[in-house]
Amino acid sequence: MVKCTYGYDFNIDVEDLSLKADHVFEYLRPYNCIYLDSGRSCIKILCQLFAGRELLVPAFSCFSVIYGFTEGVKPVFYNVHEDLTIDFEDLEKKITAATAGIYVTNYFGHMISEEDAERLAGLKAQYGLIVVEDNTQSVFSGDLKIGDYAVASIRKWFPVPDGGVIYSKNSLATLDIRGLRRESKQIRKLYPQIMKSMLLREVIDFPAAQIAEMFAEVERELDAYSDNGEIFLMNEFTEFIYRCNSVGDMIKKRQENEKYLRACLNSPYLRPVLPKLNEGECPFNLPMYCTCRDQMRDYLVETCSIYPSVLWRTHRYDPVNGIGNIAEMGRQIMSFPIDQRYDKEDMDFLAEAINEFRL
């Protein structure tokens, strides 16, 4: 019987579903918001702002960003340094008369610096550009730094089946969402999410691999309908589950776990991707460069039921793997789970397993 798994998909425990005051809708109340089924859908809607023009996009991005633009938007990829800061020399030389905007990613809970935000503001004013912040990994790290609009796949933060948001201090009235329905197939993720809770509580004896395959099947469905251009509003039951999750408690637990695990790691194969988070920033997970990433990950999965995330395999993405050091970043970066499911004892277990690994 599986006692616990670390990382991978969230489980939903129905006994925890009680309404909270500080849910995500309250957190984002200062903004105008459109809630959709996924971050991919949000990107497709935002493409209306850049139809037929070029959008500068960071080369270190996920598959859904690199290949996700529609409406005739042409992504032009700019380099990102190993510390995930913008390569402004590369960015500026790629601005042309066809450029409509800049897409900026705040990685792993770390917001861009004030200096970089000011530099982007200068480019925005000089060329009349629209700036979009991708805050999928940093939505709970504070206010927008420079973006006219922001996008976030908030489903990655909580035990929910779906959810993405476009948010802005500007009006969103120009974005056309007429005819969108609340019929996302992502609601089917509830089945494996609840079964995983039952498995972890030892209520059922069911092959963990089959539950993992159920999660994978839902993601394949998302891939299929997203590729077909289908977009859905957030499911109503998903809204209820979001209202049962405290943002404040989530932020506090992630901050504690990230700080503790970072201090405990001493593997000779690892080095931090980012410096320590600034005051008030909320970590998505703990990213590390690993000189033997795939070997360590295989060991952790097979021996300890630890599932580190690989964000992202950019060495496999043809549009970006020839830019700067993006390919090598895709081969080495691995992210360890520090989310609100876990406590200090769990971080001790992770640290011991990671530190004990040897080639």
Where are each of the predicted segments found?
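PLP-dependent aminotransferase class I/II
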Residues: 7-11, 23-24, 30-34, 61, ...
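PLP-dependent aminotransferase-like
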Residues: 10-29, 44-126, 138
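Short, charged, surface-exposed secondary-structure boundary motifs
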Residues: 67, 84-90, 159-165, 318-321
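Hydrophobic beta-strand scaffold residues
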Residues: 75-76, 131, 308
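Short, Asp-centered acidic motifs that coordinate Mg2+ and/or phosphate
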Residues: 101, 130, 149
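Hydrophobic residues in beta-strands of the RecA-like P-loop NTPase core, especially within AAA+ ATPase
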Residues: 105, 132-133
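Conserved active-site segment immediately N-terminal to the catalytic lysine
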Residues: 133-167
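Short helix-loop capping/hinge motifs at secondary-structure junctions, enriched
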Residues: 157, 171-175, 343
